[in-house]
Design a protein with these regions (language model features):
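Bacterial N-terminal signal peptides
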Residues: 14-25
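Bacterial N-terminal signal peptides that target proteins for export
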Residues: 2-14
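Second-shell loop/turn segments in exported
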Residues: 31-35, 50-60, 86-89, 132-143, ...
Length: 311
């Protein structure tokens, strides 16, 4: 699972340089400092990891909400809070919230939605020790990496506005319940239900979810639900990655994964997830910052920027 690749640092800087040259030749884009954005995203991931567990009603959760809303207030054209309630087994309710950043662009048409969950697993259910299974995880990669990439994109979209309308959506409750309980992907399910009540003209034309994209040994295969729902989106993404000479994007299919893209795919919206599921620390207490890499965040960020510019 934990594959080793040689000469990673050289390959990373060569791939980013190759990508930028190719991108500026094919797209009327302004050059940007990729190293700067890499540091920005890594700083966010450091902060999120320092917050500790970030599931609803924890201190880390509240700090994360404040961070996301502060970044949105600084960079987005508008910030929306979508509050919803989850029924508890004791008959009570628990409040959760999705945060949406709106970037209007200057072109007509439906927006592109990029999403990530910001919550973390309340229990380490993949630990072999039953005692450890009751402890909450830090979730540096699972919950932290996707959030950090979206926060970095928010700054980019402010500093280099693009014509395409974009929504950045931070989901609550993705990792809340036991597997198979129906108490997972709560934020994305809520937003899909919210869209059902809206005019289809307001629906996103495409959904791209980023999840677990920060690990040091990053390799993103094509996920099978994504291939069924959004094959053309995957083609866009992997074509950009190919020009970028990014070995982190593998065009083969490997996993079938339930994630935040499925509620939108259920509406008929082309939806995909970018995820590296070959991560031995998934839902374990060892999902910590030292397992992550700023290079991985930067590669995913650069590919997403390229996709947005070419849309």
């Amino acid at each position: 699972m934990n594959k080793v690749r040689g000469n990673r640092i050289f390959n990373y800087f060569w791939s980013v340089s190759f990508f930028l040259v190719a991108l500026f030749e094919t797209v009327n884009a302004q050059p940007y400092n990729s190293e700067r954005y890499s540091k920005v995203m890594w700083n966010y991931l450091e902060v999120l990891s320092e917050f500790g567990p970030r599931y609803v009603e924890t201190e880390g959760y509240e700090k994360t909400l404040r961070l996301i809303k502060r970044v949105g207030g600084e960079f987005a054209d508008e910030v929306l809070e979508h509050t919803f309630f989850v029924k508890q087994h004791d008959g009570g309710q628990r409040q959760m919230v999705n945060i949406e950043f709106i970037f209007n662009g200057n072109a007509e048409g439906r927006p592109i939605l990029l999403g990530a969950h910001y919550d973390t697993r309340p229990f380490a259910d993949q630990e072999s020790n039953p005692v450890l299974q009751t402890h909450p995880i830090t979730g540096s990669n699972d919950g932290g990496s996707g959030t950090s990439v979206l926060l970095g994109l928010a700054q980019y979209l402010k500093e280099y506005p693009i014509k395409q309308p974009v929504r950045l959506l931070f989901f609550d409750g993705e990792d809340f319940g036991q597997s198979g309980s129906g108490e997972m992907f709560l934020g994305s399910k809520y937003h899909a239900d919210f869209l059902r009540k809206e005019s289809r003209e307001k629906w996103p034309q495409a959904v791209i979810i980023v999840d677990m994209v920060g690990d040091k040994d990053l390799e993103i295969f094509k996920e099978t639900y994504s291939m069924a729902s959004g094959p053309k989106i995957l083609d866009r993404i992997y074509n950009v990655a190919k020009r970028m000479n990014s070995f982190q994007f593998n065009e083969k299919s490997k996993y079938t994964i339930q994630d935040d893209h499925l509620p939108f795919a259920g509406l008929g919206i082309p939806s995909v997830v970018l995820i590296d599921f070959d991560y031995p620390y998934w839902h374990k207490l060892s999902d910590t910052l030292d397992k992550c890499s700023p290079e991985s965040l930067s590669v995913v960020f650069s590919v997403l920027v390229g996709v947005l510019l070419e849309w």
